Amino acid sequence: MSIASVASVFKGEHAVGSTVTVRGWVRTRRDSKAGISFLAVYDGSCFNPIQGVVPNSLENYDNEVLKLTAGCSVIVTGEIVESPGAGQAYELQVTQVEVTGWVEDPDTYPMAAKRHSIEHLRELAHLRPRTNIIGAVARVRNCLSQAIHRFYHENGFVWVSTPLITASDCEGAGEMFRVSTLDMENLPRTSDGKVDYDKDFFGKEAFLTVSGQLNGETYACALSKIYTFGPTFRAENSNTSRHLAEFWMVEPEVAFATLSDIANLAEGMLKYAFNAVLAERMDDLQFFAQHVDKTVIERLQSFVSSDFAQVDYTDAVEILQKCGREFEFPVSWGIDLSSEHERYLAEEHFKAPVVVKNYPKDIKAFYMRLNEDGKTVAAMDVLAPGIGEIIGGSQREERLDVLDMRLEEMDLNKEDYWWYRDLRRYGTVPHAGFGLGFERLVSYVTGVSNIRDVIPFPRAPRTANF
């Protein structure tokens, strides 16, 4: 007996005429008057289920096979034959069906209905991977993850695991989740009435990280090329389709690199990842094109064949001001570009992915390198047609005196960043990096517009079930 995934059967990895065993769940059962049942069995290895043709001669046909409903788990053994019907190349002539798990009450099984709204599925996050759409999202998400790791490995990067618990606020925004073991009902106090964090687990205030970047820089300044890939947290009270409180970030950091270098790195990484999805997950992409967003395949193909445009922030503002479009948010030099501005640039003006660079210093973080004009920093955003910003990055400020000045300007205590400042005191180097919000990438590739539907268990304001 050979255990086979549904995907391996469809790929022709098992000879026609060979006997295999497929383990999975029933999607549908259809009975014919000729005493044959057709079971659609899926195991999650690919989009389509495999059809099993079950004769009524099986010993358990009447008392088990005819009672199978959507969601029942089965182990099906049979001979691979070429399928006479359209839609799939192979099917199984079943010789044995073992039922490993029944659905207790098929009438109340939440996934029994043919179609649920995506909003309703969020309330059933523990069962929604069984649906076509969330299963397809999971496979694409995995494909993108693996491709990103391969890309960095093939380009000589070291994967660094940065801490999830930190005392540093990378963005200087203060929107952080506190980590504490103090008794909330009986908080220790200092003499002036403030919470005494000396008595806490770490002996100081601690938070969930908003970014692995600062820690990543320490390793880039020793190993030259590193990347992080892990969860980050923002206590941002935003109930939108674009925000999560817990999400994953890809953050490369490169020593001796300029803003131009990481713009090229971002382009290479995105094209590598998108090409992987086009090559490996076309079955899922075809589903998304049919049921979610008809442009997904064409959009990815266009992306990987396009050269990235580049434009200075100042020039981008001028383009937006002169385009004749009335935007909801008026455009002026010094504002942070909104999604409508970003999408106009990528979709209508350049009609290609675009790198906007050299932003005003007052709207960017303290660690971004100050340009010679004293007004802008060496920062960039990568804007993609169909979604807007997908990557944000910068050349880092490697000059200690300028870094200290920026910390002071932003009312940040430089003593809190003593270790980060040490990198500038001991063999400082120009270096640069960027951050990619991974869920936003999955959303772009699948066309699934709400970011809560491209992560297994979304965390958002007042949403922490499961």
From Swiss-Prot:
Q: Which GO terms describe its biological process?
A: asparaginyl-tRNA aminoacylation
What InterPro entries does the annotation carry? Answer: Aa-tRNA-synt_II, aa-tRNA-synth_II, aa-tRNA-synth_II/BPL/LPL, Asn-tRNA-ligase, Asp/Asn-tRNA-synth_IIb, NA-bd_OB-fold, NA-bd_OB_tRNA
Name the record gives this protein: Asparagine--tRNA ligase
Its EC number(s): 6.1.1.22
The record's catalysed reaction(s) read: tRNA(Asn) + L-asparagine + ATP = L-asparaginyl-tRNA(Asn) + AMP + diphosphate + H(+)
Localization per record: Cytoplasm
* Keyword presence, Protein biosynthesis: yes
Q: Which UniProt keywords apply?
A: Aminoacyl-tRNA synthetase, ATP-binding, Cytoplasm, Ligase, Nucleotide-binding, Protein biosynthesis
Q: Which family does it belong to?
A: Belongs to the class-II aminoacyl-tRNA synthetase family.
Q: List the Gene3D superfamilies.
A: Bira Bifunctional Protein, Domain 2, Nucleic acid-binding proteins
Assigned GO CC terms = cytoplasm
Q: Name the species this protein comes from.
A: Shewanella sp. (strain MR-4)
Enzyme class of the recorded protein, top EC level: ligase
Quaternary arrangement and interactors, per the entry?
Homodimer.
* Molecular functions (GO terms): asparagine-tRNA ligase activity; ATP binding; nucleic acid binding
